[in-house]
Amino acid sequence: PHLYRLLHALNRPARFILCDGDLVEAKNLIRQNFAPADLGQNKARVLAERYASVFGMKAEYVPSFVETREELMRLIRPGIWEIKEGPYLYKLKREMVLLLGCVDNNKSRRLCHEAFCQSQDLVYIDSGNEEFSGQVVCGVRRNGRTIFKPVGGIAPEILKAQDRFPSEI
């Protein structure tokens, strides 16, 4: 909710898309932003509808896992905005794209890493946690150059992991 609140406060054109094929379970009530009334519902839908109603800012959702590079690249393609800077002057501005990799498997992290490497401009924030520890890594690409390495550049062993997408389990 904090990122959504920030986007709302900045009053900038933004697209907010949540993708998740998981349903809310009792164990999610402890560490995630869900309430008992959400049990059994799609996580992406619950959060998108909640944030849209609270902040009055549109939120989109995909109620399934993103498991192909093509689908991920389509979702993170930046929009172009035309901004008037004077009576006869218009400027085209590219949307800033943030990819939040809140995934629980390394095959999905590898997919996000590949999308990061193919993007011109992208901020990719990956988070992961265990019972008593966790990490957040922020990778940044600007004009086709990596400014800050993504999680796969810092911990390359995750790119070699042999786990599966959630739908393959």
Feature map (PLM): residue ranges:
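Adenine nucleotide-associated cytosolic modules
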Residues: P1-I169
